[in-house]
Amino acid sequence: MGRLGKAGTEKGVVMSRCSVRVLCAVLVSCVFGGPPAGAATEQVVYSFLGGSDGAHPSSSPINVVGTLYGTTSLGGANASGTVFSVTPAGVETVLHAFTGGSDGSYPWSSLIHLGGKLYGTAAGGGANGSGVVFAMSKAGAETVVYSFTGAGDGIEPLGRLIAVGGTLYGTTYAGGGYSCYDNDGCGTVFSVTPEGAETVLYAFKGGIDGAEPYGRLTYANGTFYGTTDFGGTHGDRGTVFAVTQTGPENLVHSFKGGRDGNNTEAGLIDVGGTLFGTTLYGGGSGCEGGGCGTVFSITPDGKERVVYVFKGGNDGAVPIAGLIELHGTLFGTTYEGGAGNAGTVFSLTPAGVEKVIHSFGGGSDGAGPVGLINVDGMLYGATNAGGGSGCYGGGCGTVFSVNP
């Protein structure tokens, strides 16, 4: 599956599925400035070199008082990932280089700012080699909030944390006590307090309830909504699920494959009470017969609609990241496809009209974009590769801006 093993063994970072996560550069446009009128649509903010500065940013940095904070899944002094900051001028500083020991390793998820601290997850490392939830000061002092045991509490926290009422909520890709695929478990939904008290809200069984949740949760009207990469009623094609703070899980939708799409690793967004998301594959017969992915909408009571089917050509393929909404239009990225076959930034109307805003060339502008965020009308994001000749010639990733 291309994910991390229990002990945090990296299994292919630059790929079109499980090993990339979103880097969305959250910047303030009035500070950053944005591209001038008439300039190229896309601009590179920072290119990772793959050494001590980190490699393959895999999640969404956040803006805290004009400074960008984020993670790289690899690189750093110990080749186990970093927490970094970047100024609007593109000056990068490594705040913490993970050792791969008790402090964690391979931080896929983005950070969250809560109570003056940064919180995040690392998929590997920790006291039991099963990942950690960590806290960090903006000066770089890291503490482990919770170290997963590798048993019923979960293994490999990959999705971003969210905060509700001062408590953190997230998912683990494996663990939970039920046998699934490689016997590591099928994943969990959990809560953890800043003081380190962890509670499993739901442990996936790997059947119709779903298996291996990857993306971040969305909270709406007292319920958490999320997706699983596998499981469901149609042969491991993934699900949309709902779970309350007290734990009961409800299957909202089971992907069928074909036009309906299959396998999703992105979180959902709530737009006026309707949830929107992406599937990696399905939708048609392109992309070697497996389909090139879809954008879908779904109501909390399970009414699903395919908004757009990617064809795998200039329109893009494999939308691995989630969506954002701006003035009634959806924006997102595809990891592959486009004119340069290195991914795209696209817009999509609710009626299903898609427009490619930028096609990545795979060189200095990056390759494999993995997510966007809107800041005052400007889009910021990152590519998992490209930007230079490091990381075995494929580039170590970039932070970029796009004027929609």
Regions found by a protein language model. Name each.
Residues G2-P404:
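Extracellular beta-propeller repeat domains
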